[in-house]
Amino acid sequence: MANELQPLSLLFQNRLFLIPDYQRGYAWLQQQLVDFWDDLVNLQADRYHYTGLLSLKPLKCKETVSWGEDLWLVENGYKPCHIVDGQQRITTFVILLNEIVGFVRGLNENKGKSDKEITLGYETVEEIVSKYICRKRPPNGVVTTYLFGYEVDNPSAEYMKYKVFDEPYSGAVNETYYTKNLKFAKNFFAENIRKLYEESGEGGLEAVNTLYKKLTQRLMFNLHEIDDDYDVFVAFETMNNRGKKLTNLELLKNRLIYLTTLYDDEVFDEKDKSALRKKINDTWKEVYYQLGRNKSVPLSDDDFLRAHWIIYFRYSRKRGDDYIKFLLSKFSSKGIFEKAPVLVETEAESVISDDVTDADDTEVTETEEQEIIEVSKLQPKEIEDYVNSLKAVSYTHLRAHETE
């Protein structure tokens, strides 16, 4: 287990960062961005700034088999990691770094130059991009692998690649509440870098160089690598409720995905677990899409969850957070580990007497056996039914608000 202070220039050495599916999307708003920017700009060039905890879960080979064309970096010694805690800060860092690179590329003195010819903080832009943003697989460079991103079924994955990193040929890219935050952060940093450059007069380029060096060398993370036997779902729920708290919708998603991992393989095998997990992810993708369709006035997560709770569980109470207390109690590990007896009837067996000599006189008797087995009180089907209902109601919830 690693537990040490490191700047981002070391953190990004031979690592691939991925935000897992149980994580929320990018949740920082203007106030968090202003605080981050002010801390960085006001940091003295010879001082360090403690940025907080970064908890990583190293991934095993079997957890990366679906990465396809991106596996080449793993095969070349890169260490794939899930970000359990600290993803908001790392995402912010990557967005800001990308905007610094884009700004320097666009300066008049760099027009027509390749990334090999443009320097920033004693490094070429080509070196910076390959260290912090993406690598192209040699020799042809057809495959581009990003060093930071989201699970592929997360709408933010495509948005990050095409709208934040500006990779061309995106086609249609879905937008959500979280991608709106990514867009805001990108524009926020682009504008502030431009202002910093202009307000610094003749020292504008040096000011941007200093910003880059402070960003990569002076922001210190407390790196913590989580052991294999550590419960990352519980860790995520605990850690991410300390700073900008998880919404109830985010908390519930993490809880349901966590529960899918607890069933015995004999009852619910890996393919079933993967299918249910995908169904949960697809449902949350649809829910966030419906709630965020009106980008200027997105619908409330809490109002939606409460409304669905009343419909699905036929509750009429509307006091405070009754609904989330009920849901987190209903969908808990206790419901899986506690067993309930179930009576199972086996098929009847036909028994033919050995004494029979005439086929017409064959005496057939049937014996029935009954067996009691222990099963989890909370069955996978119950989770699936709830998730399906949540997805269906998200659309009608939107329609109801449109007609108000």
Regions flagged by a language model, labelled:
Residues 1-402:
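Flexible coil/loop and intrinsically disordered segments
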